[in-house]
Amino acid sequence: MDLSGVKKKSLLGVKENNKKSSTRAPSPTKRKDRSDEKSKDRSKDKGATKESSEKDRGRDKTRKRRSASSGSSSTRSRSSSTSSSGSSTSTGSSSGSSSSSASSRSGSSSTSRSSSSSSSSGSPSPSRRRHDNRRRSRSKSKPPKRDEKERKRRSPSPKPTKVHIGRLTRNVTKDHIMEIFSTYGKIKMIDMPVERMHPHLSKGYAYVEFENPDEAEKALKHMDGGQIDGQEITATAVLAPWPRPPPRRFSPPRRMLPPPPMWRRSPPRMRRRSRSPRRRSPVRRRSRSPGRRRHRSRSSSNSSR
């Protein structure tokens, strides 16, 4: 009996030791299974990272195409920076030891972004350059137009060829003026108005027109303040009249509308006034009604008497 009990105890102890050893050190087959599972997980992670990197590359390609179509350099630099950052993140997820290199790459990508943004801000796009060039060309083309207008306005007026002679005595005639002023140049015309009542007497002034403006200037210098028939005369230049614009064609007068009929001529105020006596009429009737009653009462009293 004692031997059987001892055998049972020894068997129980051996079983417990086997359990402890199994819990402490797993079997080599289990280790292989676990290593296979870990390798599968790693391969899955690598496949996922590869897919993400391929997606990022596809996105970068599409962005590059868009940037090439638009012709903007800033979008290209951003796509390159995003591709570098995607590659750095894939390397960081695959191995923990390359985390420092990923951080350095991300830092370099951020610096490249800042440099690309600064370059894009420094160098404007070709479309903006075209707009700026158009604005500059327009602004440059405006000043010559103003200069031309100012030159046209400042154009010198033609020199006068006609001279007005005033304060002449009534004894002076056209022949006298012809003799005096013909010494300065060829005279084109002499106009000497005469009084209506006395046609043999002049009005005291005359107009002498020369062929050249230089001759008219000579006559002005020598004869302004000179004497004819013992009296000082005045000589002034007559400016050429500005060309008047042609008279405007007046439109024919508009036909007057016929007057409205009599029943339409009355203004609305008269209508309002015409309504007011109608409103007052019942008041007058009320005021007359007591008088009528009095007359009736008097007539009734007379009849009773």
From Swiss-Prot:
Subcellular location: Nucleus; Nucleus speckle; Cytoplasm
GO molecular function annotation: mRNA 3'-UTR binding; RNA binding
Region described as Necessary for interaction with the cleaved p110 isoform of CDC2L1: spans on this chain: 1-220
Composition skew (Basic and acidic residues), residue ranges: 33-59
Recorded superkingdom: Eukaryota
Tissues of expression: Ubiquitous.
Record region (Disordered): 1-170, 240-305
Residues covered by region (Necessary for interactions with UPF2 and UPF3B and UPF2-dependent NMD): 69-121
Region called Necessary for interaction with SRP54, nuclear localization and exon-skipping, residue ranges: 1-161
A GO-annotated cellular component: nuclear speck
Biased composition range(s): Pro residues: 242-262
Positions of modified residues (Phosphothreonine): 161
Keyword Nucleus found: yes
Pfam family, one: RRM_1
SUPFAM superfamilies: RNA-binding domain, RBD
Ranges of biased composition (kind: Basic residues): 1-10, 127-143, 151-167, 266-298
Region (Necessary for interaction with PNN and exon-skipping): 156-242
Subunit composition and interactions: Found in mRNA splicing-dependent exon junction complexes (EJC). Found in a post-splicing complex with NXF1, RBM8A, UPF1, UPF2, UPF3A, UPF3B and RNPS1. Component of the heterotrimeric ASAP (apoptosis- and splicing-associated protein) and PSAP complexes consisting of RNPS1, SAP18 and either ACIN1 or PNN, respectively; the ASAP and PSAP complexes probably are formed mutually exclusive. Component of the active spliceosome. Associates with polysomes. Interacts with the cleaved p110 isoform of CDC2L1, CSNK2A1, PNN, SART3, SRP54, SRRM1 and TRA2B/SFRS10.
Summary of the function given for this chain in its UniProt record: Part of pre- and post-splicing multiprotein mRNP complexes. Auxiliary component of the splicing-dependent multiprotein exon junction complex (EJC) deposited at splice junction on mRNAs. The EJC is a dynamic structure consisting of core proteins and several peripheral nuclear and cytoplasmic associated factors that join the complex only transiently either during EJC assembly or during subsequent mRNA metabolism.
Protein name listed in UniProt: RNA-binding protein with serine-rich domain 1
Chain's gene name: RNPS1
